Amino acid sequence: MAMAAVNCLILVDLQAAFVSGPVAVPGATVLLAAATDLLARARQARSLIIHLQNDGAPGMEDEPGTSGWVLFVEPGAGETVIRKTTDDGFDGTNLGDILAAGRIRRLAVTGVMSEMCVSATARSALHRGLAVVLPHDAHATYDIPAVPGIAPAIPAAMVARVAEWALGDQLELPVTGRDVQFTAAPYGDLGEVSAKPA
């Protein structure tokens, strides 16, 4: 049975440091291919598009104003950029208000990190009664290093798989982003918004 279309795409922390250069996540190439395809089709369908941008602490790769903090994919006209300081894109931001104003009930999520910001944002959306689609190839993270006496190193792909599994049965989990279909946001173009954390 075909999956119902979504009318919103949330791109989580697709910032330069995490998807390009020496500290990019191991699965950056696959992630970017999936994310850019999702974005292109969401734009074509006139879905609501929201870019989350994390404001890291001083000295971190995503510290505001640094090259690593910049969004890797430039937002288009009419797309929303929401800056945040915690894993959950809803926490201290107007993301929930924007989704409500746009009458969004089904959304797709892509980005990093699988077990942190992607998971936290997807879980909050589910708790708000929204249908969430998270393509398996459209999120990524880092390896977890070994800790003597606790566990060996855990590969990033396994971390990502556990993260999506932990979101439970309500999550819709297509194998690839190509399985996701988009439709226009019912409330139309909300206009470009750039919001800093509250």
Predicted regions and their residues:
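N-terminal nucleotide-binding beta1-loop-alpha1 segment
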Residues: I10-L14
